[in-house]
């Protein structure tokens, strides 16, 4: 049943994405994180030790709660009817994937750049990146969009695919809970330096293997999409550690090498300057069409992940 649910969920995401009218599990997770953080901060001392404890409790409760609730719902649905159980798993597998949404948002950035509407392009890219965008040049907007497609190809598409192939929708949504915690709490600023540490470390562990598999898939994908596979391999080997996170530069470096452009570098977050290292070599200037090229590689890489994962699961069954 798991394999059918994964394939069905993949198709659902490719066809429909995440409709705006439908409440997404990640939104519910975000609300739970905010309320749990508020509850714990009000009851624990505001010392580093108190914040570390609060963050650890959050990092334990949300993933465990997500797995238990979704597992119980899937089991109850399957007990009522195998078809209902499959439908629930398929629906949640589709919601755990973000390929179509990522492609739509990044293509909107591309559309504004092509129209030379820089303010609109900045606004569009601000929906999918965490950095400050109000002063970005057209090149900076393009770079930000390509980077987010490359990074989210791993944690928004390939990693959830791998987890759902192992444990169905419950494990995929548990991964999304971990990923959501990191995106909300995993900042190294005054507010979250201690409270967000457990969430950030847990996300590093959850993404360690998937991010590296995603990078290798991206290298393979470059050969099938008219990009530079040798360059992708070379830059991945050289620059995959050029990030504070052990995972974020994995697919970014493979993407930069495949396209022959330079990504990353210094950026502003919440008004604060971060002197981050660059990734890749600027063999040519980055251009809006690179957003479309990155999307194409993201789709092909996710297709490879599904096909190879399904084949391995079928072989082991």
Features from the language model and the residues they span:
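Glycine-rich phosphate/dinucleotide-binding loop and adjoining beta-alpha-beta core of small-molecule
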Residues: 183
């Amino acid at each position: 049943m798991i394999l059918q649910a994964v394939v069905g969920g993949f198709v659902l995401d490719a066809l429909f994405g995440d409709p705006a009218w439908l409440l997404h599990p990640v939104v519910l997770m975000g609300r739970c994180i905010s309320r749990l953080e508020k509850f714990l901060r009000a009851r624990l001392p505001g010392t580093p030790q108190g914040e570390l404890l609060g963050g650890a409790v959050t990092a334990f409760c949300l993933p465990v709660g997500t797995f238990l609730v979704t597992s119980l719902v899937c089991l109850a649905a399957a007990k009522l009817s195998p078809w209902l159980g499959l439908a629930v798993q398929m629906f949640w597998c589709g919601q755990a994937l973000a390929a179509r949404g990522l492609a739509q948002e990044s293509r909107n950035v591309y559309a504004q750049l092509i129209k030379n509407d820089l303010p609109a392009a900045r606004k569009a890219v601000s929906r999918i990146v965490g950095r400050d965008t109000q002063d970005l040049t057209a090149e900076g907007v393009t770079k930000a969009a390509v980077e987010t497609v490359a990074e989210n190809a791993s944690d928004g598409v390939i990693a959830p695919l791998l987890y759902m192939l192992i444990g169905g929708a419950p494990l995929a949504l548990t991964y999304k809970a971990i990923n959501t915690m990191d995106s909300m709490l995993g900042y190294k600023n005054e507010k979250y330096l201690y409270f967000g540490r457990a969430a950030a470390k847990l996300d590093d562990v959850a993404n360690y293997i998937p991010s590296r598999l995603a990078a290798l898939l991206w290298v393979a994908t470059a050969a099938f999409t008219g990009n530079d596979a040798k360059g992708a391999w070379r830059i991945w080997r050289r620059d995959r550690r050029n990030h504070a996170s052990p995972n974020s530069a994995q697919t970014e470096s493979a993407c930069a090498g495949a396209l022959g452009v330079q990504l990353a570098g210094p950026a502003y977050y919440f008004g604060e300057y971060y002197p981050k290292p660059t990734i890749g070599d600027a063999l040519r200037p980055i251009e809006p069409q690179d957003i479309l090229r990155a999307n194409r590689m993201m789709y092909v890489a996710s297709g490879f992940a599904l096909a190879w994962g399904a084949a391995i699961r079928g072989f082991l069954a």
